[in-house]
Every structure is written in C-alpha cells, then in structure tokens.
Design a protein with these regions (language model features):
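Metal-dependent amide/peptide-bond hydrolase catalytic core
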Residues: 2-220
C-alpha cells in the first residue's frame, strides 16, 4: 500500500510492499482455586496469578529481537529520506542494530513489532460479584509470530511462563507466518517496475505485515 510516513520521522509517501506476514494465535489462560468470600481472601488467588503472569511477560519481554533481512532492507531503502541523524542510524544497522533494538519499540510500536514475536493481553474474566473470590479466572491474548521464532517456539515460551505461574494454557486458534518473499527475486523486481510505471518517483520498500490478511491462503 501507499503509506505516508511509514516510520515516525520519515516524511512523504512510500509504496510499502508486504513481503511476509506474521503468524497469529488466540490463546486463553486459566487460573483455578477453591474460591471463597472476599472478607477472608486466600493467598495467590486466580486473578493474582494471572496478574503476576502478565507482569512477568511485560517486564521480561521473552521474545528475541532480530533484524531480519527484509527489515534491514526496509530501513536501508527508507534511510535516504530520513533526517540526518535518523538517516545515519538507519543506513548503518551493521553498527547501530543493538541500539535500534532497544530504541525502536519505544519510538514506534509498529516498527518494534517487526523485530520479534509479540503478545497482547486483550480479554479477562473472573468473579461475577465484587465480594466473591472466583474459582476460575481467565485471560485472553493475541500473539503474532516472527519467522526467527515461529509458531511452535513462541507458543512453547509462553506455555512455560504460564506453567510457572500455575496457569492452564489453551491455544484457541493458530497459524504460522507466511514464507518471506525473495526481495532480490524477479517477482519483487516486477512489482517494483509496475509501481514505478504507475506512480513515477514514488519510493518502493519491502514491508513486514504485522497484521493478518488473506495472504496465507495463497501460499503453495
């Protein structure tokens, strides 16, 4: 798609060509106990365990950050259009990659998601009353898998953390990432040529699809 300012600080319009799509999963975590009345709360209640699990994941960021070739190519192509300081960093990832791994997720959630598997906690349920300790509390999350830590490895990492906090984990739905396109191949070059003929002068760059599309159904 044609995207204005694809990364914060880089002005202008760019033709961003999706070259792979992250996988995704919907995951449910359940904590159980005997329940009880809020006037005499027990230790380590279901909601407390779920909260400790969320804090653990958010604080320790269990997924590995990496500049995949497609992401490196994106930064290299966008670098000439960035202000000097940003251009210097983006055009020399061989030197600044460790710094960018730390800074990028803080500057742009979208760009940060291109470096690693992500998990977002989205749903929660517990007791139906303020004064009742739940016998069961649940937590829902959405995961997006990156190629260097795909579906199986990413789910295994989260499962280990869930078990550490005494939680059950159910994978409600999952599918792995789509295979990356060869950004140096003829198919990608042909797309570039068509964009150049249709929109003369518009910069073209590979792009990571962090959201889900129907692209997975077109894989051989």
């Amino acid at each position: 798609g044609i995207i204005p300012e694809p990364i914060g600080g880089i002005p202008g319009n760019f033709a961003m060509v999706g070259v792979f799509e992250k996988g995704k999963a919907d995951v449910k975590f359940t904590a159980r106990s005997t329940g009880g009345h809020a006037s005499a709360p027990t230790a380590n209640t279901p909601i407390a365990r779920l909260s400790a699990f969320v804090t653990d994941v958010e604080k320790h960021a269990p997924f590995r950050k990496k500049f995949l070739p497609e992401v490196t190519a994106m930064f290299t192509r966008l670098a000439p259009y960035a202000p000097f300081g940003l251009r210097l960093v983006m055009g020399n990832l061989w030197l600044f990659a460790p710094l960018m791994k730390v800074v990028l997720p803080r500057v742009s959630a979208q760009a940060g998601a291109m470096l690693r598997t992500t998990i977002a906690f989205t749903m929660q349920s517990g007791s139906d009353a303020y004064n009742v300790l739940p016998q069961e509390a649940t937590l829902g999350a959405n995961m997006r898998f990156i190629p260097h830590q795909g579906e199986q490895e990413s789910l295994a990492i989260i499962r280990r953390l869930a078990e550490k906090h005494g939680l059950e984990m159910e994978v409600v739905h999952t599918n792995d990432y789509s295979e990356p396109v060869d950004i140096h191949g003829e198919a990608f070059r042909q797309v570039e040529r068509v964009i150049g003929e249709t929109f003369p002068g518009l910069p073209v760059s590979p792009y990571v699809m962090t959201g889900a599309t129907d692209a997975q159904f077109y894989q051989p």
